[in-house]
Structure formats: C-alpha cells, structure tokens
Amino acid sequence: ERNDVFCTGVEHKMGAHGSATCAMSFGDNENCTGYLLGERGRGMNIMFQMLNETRLEVGIMALGGSSAALQYAVDYARTRLQGVHFSKMFEAAAPKVPIIEHPDVTRMLMGMKALVEAERMLSYYAAMQIDLSKLLEGEASREARSIVDILIPLIKAGNSENAWQITAEAIQVHGGYGYCSDYPVEQLAVDCKVLSIVEGTNGIQSLDLVMRKILLNADRKNYKVLKSRIEQTIENASGIVDDVYRNMLLEGLQQMDSILDTMKKHMDEGRYHTLLLNVDPLRRAFFDLMLAWMHLWCLTLARPKLSALTAGAKGEALTEVLARDAEAAFYYGKVCASEFWLATEFPKYFGKMEGISLGETVDFLPGNAVFSSHPCA
C-alpha cells in the first residue's frame, strides 16, 4: 500500500544532480501509519548515533572530491603550455613551458596537496579509532571513542569547507577552461558545496564540537585524550623534525587550552551570546591545529625514509634520484607538502586565535537589530 505517502515536487539544485532531492508528503489524506523506532522520546539520541557515522561519510565524500580536483589540476598543469620559465623571462626566444613550472601555480598545487593529504591522514586516523573502540576493551576502548567523538565534527566540517576552497583553486589552475563544463573541476565544485550543509550544517558541527564534545564533556576527557596524543607526536618528532615546527604545534595547543578555559568561563557566567559567536571561528582554528598535527606526524615518518633513499643527495643529484626512484619521489612529496603547510599556512592559526580573543570584546545585539538599516528583498 502507498500509506498516504506522496512526492510533491523535485527540487532543482546547483549540483549533485545524480541524487534526486524531493519534497515528500506524509498523511495529507489522514491515512498514513507511522511506526515508533526505539523508545518514545529518545529519537534525537538514536538519530545522533546514526549521524556520527554519516557525518564522517560526508567528510570522506568531501575528501574524495578534493582529491579528484587536485589530480585534475596537476594533470592539466603538467600539459598546459603557457609562458616561459621564470629563469628565462627576459629571453624573447625562450620556449613555452608547462604551467606547473611557474612558481605561483606550484604554490597553488602545493597548498591543495597539503590540505588533501592532511585531511586524508586525519580521516584515516578517525576510522582507525572507530575500529579500535570496538576491538579494544576498558579504558583503551573509551579513549578511542573519545577521539572519535571530537574528530567527527571537525572532519565533517573541515573537509567539506576545504572542498569548496580546493575545487575553486583547481578551477583557477585551469584558467578560463576551468569555468567551462569541458573540464570536470567545475562539476566537482558545484557538487561539493552541499556537503557543508547536509547532515548538520557546519555551524551545527561547530556547536557540537565546542559545547557537547568539549565544554559539556565531563572533565573535558575527549579533549584531554586527544591532547595527549598530540603531545606524544611532538615528543616523537624530537631530533627528526625542526624544532620550529614542534614548538609551533606546542604553542598552538597552549593557546587552545587558554581559549577553551575562557569559553568555559563564559558558559559558567551565562554569557552564551559571546560564547556562541565564537564556536565557528574556534572550530575552524581547531581544524588547522589537527592538520598541523598530521603534518608533524607525517614529517616524523617521512623524513628518515627520504634520507635513507636519497643518501643526502641535493641539487641535480637529488633530481636524478627522484626521477628514477618512485618511492623516494613519494616521500619527497610528503616532506615538501608538510613543511610547506606548517611554514606558510599554520601560522594563520595564531591569527585566528587572536581574532577569537579580540572578538570577545565586540558586543552587539543578536538577531535582526544590527541589520535594521538593510531593506528587505
């Protein structure tokens, strides 16, 4: 039987056309039977158990789109001839080179690569913790669950947010062609945008992270377990990774401690407007901290392997080794991407944290009052 369920319209969307989105009507003719799943009044609790899994899946979908955009951009940059090599920019007869040899394009691709690889590491780490939470027992299982709880809103929101940025950068690498449907990066961009909206908007992920997973979590156990893992990575990197990167991550953790203490104080004092204004900026900064953790961990593993494979070769000798040894080239790419992100992108984290601190001094009425001078559309 139909059970008085009807599709009343199909939505016309920006992207994701392979997935039909429609409006459904249940019981308009008062002939629809609903069935209770689980205990009465416990629906939200049950739903959140399901959402944890689907939110991670959304983050993985976003990572897939970002990874594809990066691969398309690298492939295009390798084959698109435009301009001369920067070392011959004043030579009129200099030959054209692939745009991947232009420093600005290399920087764009490196930024995309660094984001994609750190997101992949973090997503795999979360997936491993899910398995460990089921395989281990006692406190070890609970610690794995704590890490999963705190990472899921970060991965869902961070990966989906960056997917929009990464696909846009891939379009930029393609130039005008990227804006046309001749190349797939345009579709990747419009398809990925919905991922920051579905399964709880990224603003909701921020609220979930800061309130439920940290401030309202007993003794901040989730955060403390995660922090201990990061501190272990910093310790393991000693003597392998430059101290400047280790110290940056350590300082980043200390700033996070301080901001969370301040937010807890706001909550205890009932200053929820000030608190909630800053949960999304904090979630964005927190994700940067997680990516920095992954990159430091990556350097700790990749640097010794690269040194062993290249035997300290530099300049042309290093170029020759990388050309004939795919494994050496793999680790070289890992080291370059991680160092690039830690040196050029992670410093922005500290500006974001300062902005959160200074932003607490900005006071304005919530809701419509501040926009009263804006006419309605």
Each language-model region and where it sits:
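C-terminal amphipathic alpha-helical interaction region
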Residues: L216, Q232-A377
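Internal glycine-rich alpha/beta core junctions
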Residues: E1-S258
